[in-house]
């Protein structure tokens, strides 16, 4: 039977419950325990697919085509278990399911209430999401005290009563603010947060105390005394410069051992060799490159979380320090491409809407004309096609029907029909609802021989995850190819254009894909596309002299530091 670890948060939001849950899962996995993670989101949206990235951050797409919370990306990057649509559910999904049952008459005419019907449905969704895992870590979104979270907290309280004593463990993540005028960490917010949790009926077994400095022993004892938690179970979760250091940080304080003891699990000792190698590679780079990420959501970098992590993973596997420069494409529209002058590579990610599109096209043109390594993802591929059509085919005003329905040269258009991996036909029209209706999840792509894409992947068949409505218009592909643009990947089912590139005789590294390779990158393995992209950036830096300039500046800084 599956055992459960419930992770809650207090004081403020965005403390890092997802990273804490993923780090604990990674530790348990190194001990030979089959583990999975669930994320419960209290918002009423059915999923985050239609939410503004500035409000929610990135939408992470699972292999089975679910649009989920970005925390599921952290889960997949930290453990080997692949997430599915069952690993993330929202208040919207719970109410939708309960109302559907009520309409069918499943409740036999009874009055449908939050307790027991909503809480029972939450418990059912949790049990359905654990699969065959020995331990399921369940992260409750939001903050203790939020009205929206109450049904979820009540549901997990009920589970702790209904399951055997050693089958549940509660971890509460809280904040210890440092007051500089007093010169101390303040424990009162943590005490009140735990008090509120206990009023609901939940007693934490472990406290993770987030702070910017180590937790003094006296303060640890004080917290333990006032929250009814054992002293060794009050864990100091200090800020680190890289999230991949957190498993080792928590292991040093025996979090995995405490949880195993609470759950009555006998497991082999944790083996952090792989994690230590990753950290060593991160901290001892042999190269350094600057990559321009040209987007429209750059004011909230969480919107590109998987992408930035994939670049870091590539840095690990190429022994390269990656400096990501987030550049607003609207600034390029206003001020030109001067901000790209010292970049070693340019990347245009996915996105929706017309705002900032012309700035991205200008960045792509700059990369193509100046032989700078370019990687386009989703919209980044579509705009590369538009840029090529306008400037190499001389198709003035070529565009996507997403941005200009009346364009004389619709080089991209709405996908109206495709076959998913289950073999089912999906159909769409401009009148279709926006939520959950894109081409989503893992799709098979066939790579053409003698292409850079085929060389990078080392195989002729790949599966990558998609999230888009628009595709390259097949009517224009012969013209594009005749002008020198190479279609290097096609979908196996419909022959849709999935990858494009410029021959290396015309450009050293210009590759774009319709899918999202960042969703399958992990720190352990990286991703072949990002790894090769960073190698191309290193080569460009060496040839352009950027690498020598950085080495000179680094040596100058070291010399300056030694004189002080």
Curated annotation (Swiss-Prot):
Active site (UniProt): 378 (nucleophile), 516, 518
Sites where the protein binds UTP: 13, 186-191, 222
Enzyme class: ligase
Positions in coiled-coil regions: none
Superkingdom as given in the UniProt entry: Bacteria
Alphabetized UniProt keyword annotations: ATP-binding, Glutamine amidotransferase, Ligase, Magnesium, Metal-binding, Nucleotide-binding, Pyrimidine biosynthesis
Quaternary state and interactors: Homotetramer.
Name this protein carries in UniProt: CTP synthase
Species annotation: Nitrosomonas eutropha (strain DSM 101675 / C91 / Nm57)
Gene name as annotated: pyrG
């Amino acid at each position: 039977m599956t055992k459960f670890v419930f992770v809650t948060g207090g004081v403020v939001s965005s403390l890092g419950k997802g990273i804490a849950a993923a780090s604990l899962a990674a530790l348990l996995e190194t001990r030979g325990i089959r583990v999975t993670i669930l994320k419960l989101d209290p918002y009423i949206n059915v999923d985050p697919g239609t939410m503004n990235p500035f409000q929610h951050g990135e939408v992470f797409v699972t292999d089975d085509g679910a649009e989920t919370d970005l925390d599921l990306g952290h889960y997949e990057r930290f453990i080997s278990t692949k997430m599915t649509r069952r690993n993330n559910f929202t208040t919207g999904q719970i109410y939708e399911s309960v109302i559907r049952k009520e309409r069918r008459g499943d409740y036999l005419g009874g009055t449908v209430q939050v307790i027991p019907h909503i809480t029972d449905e939450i418990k059912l969704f949790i049990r359905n999401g654990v699969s065959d895992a020995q331990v399921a870590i369940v992260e409750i979104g939001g903050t203790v005290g939020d009205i929206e979270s109450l049904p979820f907290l009540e549901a997990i309280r009920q589970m702790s009563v209904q399951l055997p004593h050693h089958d549940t463990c509660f971890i509460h993540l809280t904040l210890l603010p440092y007051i500089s005028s007093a010169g101390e960490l303040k424990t009162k917010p943590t005490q009140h947060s735990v008090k509120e949790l206990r009023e609901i009926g939940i007693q934490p077994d472990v406290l993770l105390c987030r702070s910017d400095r180590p937790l003094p022993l006296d303060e640890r004892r004080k917290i333990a005394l006032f929250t009814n938690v054992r002293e060794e179970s009050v864990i100091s979760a200090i800020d680190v410069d890289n999230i991949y250091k957190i498993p080792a940080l928590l292991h040093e304080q025996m979090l995995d051992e405490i949880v195993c003891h609470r759950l009555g699990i006998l497991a082999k000792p944790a083996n952090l060799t792989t994690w230590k190698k990753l950290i060593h590679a991160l901290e001892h780079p042999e190269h350094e490159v600057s990559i321009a990420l040209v987007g429209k959501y750059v004011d909230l970098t969480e919107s590109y979380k998987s992408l930035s992590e994939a670049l870091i993973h590539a840095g690990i596997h190429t022994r390269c320090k990656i400096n990501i420069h987030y550049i607003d494409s609207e600034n390029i529209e206003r001020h030109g491409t001067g901000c790209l002058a010292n970049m070693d590579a340019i990347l245009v990610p996915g996105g929706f809407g017309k705002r900032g599109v012309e700035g991205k096209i200008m960045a792509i043109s700059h990369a193509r004309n100046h032989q700078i390594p370019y990687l386009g993802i989703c919209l980044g591929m579509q705009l590369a096609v538009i840029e090529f059509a306008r400037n190499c085919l001389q198709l003035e005003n070529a565009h996507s029907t997403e941005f200009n329905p009346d364009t004389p040269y619709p080089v991209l258009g709405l996908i109206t029909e495709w076959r998913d991996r289950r073999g089912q036909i999906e159909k769409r029209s401009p009148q279709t609802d926006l939520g959950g209706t894109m081409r989503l999840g893992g799709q098979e792509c066939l790579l053409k021989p003698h292409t850079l894409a085929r060389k990078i992947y080392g195989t002729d068949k790949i599966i990558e995850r998609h999230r888009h409505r628009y595709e390259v218009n097949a009517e224009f592909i012969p013209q594009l190819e005749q002008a020198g643009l190479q279609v290097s990947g096609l979908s196996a089912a419909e022959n849709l254009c999935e990858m494009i590139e410029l021959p290396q005789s015309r450009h050293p590294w210009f590759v774009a894909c319709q899918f999202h390779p960042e969703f399958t990158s992990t720190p352990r393995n990286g991703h072949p596309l990002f790894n090769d992209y960073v190698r191309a950036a290193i080569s460009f830096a060496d040839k352009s002299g950027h690498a020598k300039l950085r080495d000179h500046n680094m040596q100058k800084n070291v010399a300056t530091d030694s004189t002080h």
